[in-house]
Amino acid sequence: MKFSIVINGAPWSSPSALSALQFAETVLDSGHDIYRLFFYQDGVLNSSCLCVPPQDEEDIPARWQALIESNDIDAVVCAASALKRGILDKAEEDRYDKSGHNLRQ
């Protein structure tokens, strides 16, 4: 079975991002495939490479990145949601004349 999963929750403001991550891990552990992950609304905050959680908390964005890379999953970040929340790639940094970018690659 193939799954597409939408992630709407920020990494630490609610349990939804971690729940979605654990669901995705279970899907893969059960022998199923993930067609695409779509980070939307506050879920785009999981794509920032600048998040630094307290030492006693899990690094949820890093776990998403590891899952995506180790399983070669197509991961899409909603551009409008990302821009609204200050998540930019290099092209958007240049386009909007900002001083940096923070989208995980």
Where are these regions (language model features)?
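Short, active-site-adjacent cap segments at secondary-structure transitions
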Residues: V44-S47, L83-R85
